[in-house]
From Swiss-Prot:
Organism name: Arabidopsis thaliana
Protein function: Brassicaceae-specific phytocytokine (plant endogenous peptide released into the apoplast) perceived by MIK2 in a BAK1/SERK3 and SERK4 coreceptors-dependent manner, that modulates various physiological and antimicrobial processes including growth prevention and reactive oxygen species (ROS) response regulation. Inhibits root growth and regulates root meristems. Prevents general growth and development. Exhibits antibacterial effects against Pseudomonas syringae pv. tomato DC3000, Ralstonia solanacearum, Bacillus subtilis and Agrobacterium tumefaciens, thus being an antimicrobial peptide (AMP).
Record gene name: PROSCOOP14
Signal peptide: 1-31
Biased composition (Polar residues): 64-73
Family: Belongs to the serine rich endogenous peptide (SCOOP) phytocytokine family.
Sorted UniProt keywords: Apoplast, Cell membrane, Cleavage on pair of basic residues, Membrane, Secreted, Signal
Protein name, entry field: Serine rich endogenous peptide 14
GO molecular function terms listed in the Swiss-Prot or TrEMBL record: LRR domain binding; receptor serine/threonine kinase binding
Keyword Electron transport belongs to the record: no
Keyword Transcription regulation among UniProt keywords: no
Example GO biological process: response to salicylic acid
Tissues expressing the protein: Mostly expressed in seedlings shoots and leaves, and, to a lower extent, in roots, stems, siliques, seeds and flowers.
Observed effect of gene inactivation: Slightly increased growth and fresh weight.
Sequence motif SCOOP motif, location on chain: 59-73
Amino acid sequence: MAAKTSNLVALLLSLFLLLLSISSQVGLGEAKRNLRNNLRLDCVSHPSPPPPHRSMAPPIFVPPSTSHKGQGP
């Protein structure tokens, strides 16, 4: 029974350490991204103008095929 308890404790401890490691890596990634975004915003003196507005092109009309099923073109 002591061996099962020992294995269970080791498993839970390993899972906890894995979770802690993953969460710290995610936190570091977010911190780096935020720092990069803040530095990028500091370098920009004024926002760039929005892209020009494009009008929507009309859809292309494709006539239905004149060939019948089972017959050639």
